[in-house]
Curated annotation (Swiss-Prot):
The keyword Cytoplasm applies. It is found in: Cytoplasm, Nucleoid. GO terms for molecular function: DNA binding. It comes from Bacillus cytotoxicus (strain DSM 22905 / CIP 110041 / 391-98 / NVH 391-98). Homodimer. Keywords: Cytoplasm, DNA-binding. Belongs to the YbaB/EbfC family. NCBIfam families: DNA_YbaB_EbfC. Binds to DNA and alters its conformation. May be involved in regulation of gene expression, nucleoid organization and DNA protection. Pfam families: YbaB_DNA_bd (PF02575). This is Nucleoid-associated protein Bcer98_0019. The keyword Cytoplasm applies.
Length: 109
């Protein structure tokens, strides 16, 4: 009886190590994936990766109006929030495969 228990424990440890490697690989791949957030009908675009890091900000020339800096700030903010929301969704979809069935507090993956 003890022997079977130890075998099960070893199998469980191997499965956990395998899952840990898969999670590390998925995390690494998240950093390579990119999402795009936009605002103003594409006037401002923000690129982020799956780690929620902003990689690039692009804006069309016509959106840059020295008389209305506030509008540009609002568009950059909206595009950034859109990109970060998409990065969060990507992260949840990618890492969620490892945590489904576990009752973990929100925001961990």
């Amino acid at each position: 009886m003890m022997r079977g228990g130890m075998g099960n424990m070893n199998n469980m440890m191997k499965q956990m190590q395998k899952m840990q490697k898969q999670m590390a690989k998925a995390q690494e791949e998240l950093g390579e994936k990119q999402v795009e957030g936009t605002a103003g009908g594409g006037m401002v675009t923000v690129i982020a990766n799956g780690h929620k890091q902003i990689l690039d900000v692009k804006m069309k020339e016509e959106v840059v109006d020295p008389e209305d800096i506030e509008m540009l700030q609002d568009l950059v903010l909206a595009a950034t929030n859109d990109a970060l929301k998409k990065a969060e969704e990507l992260s949840n979809a990618t890492m969620g495969q490892f945590t489904k069935g576990l009752n973990l507090p929100g925001g961990l993956f």
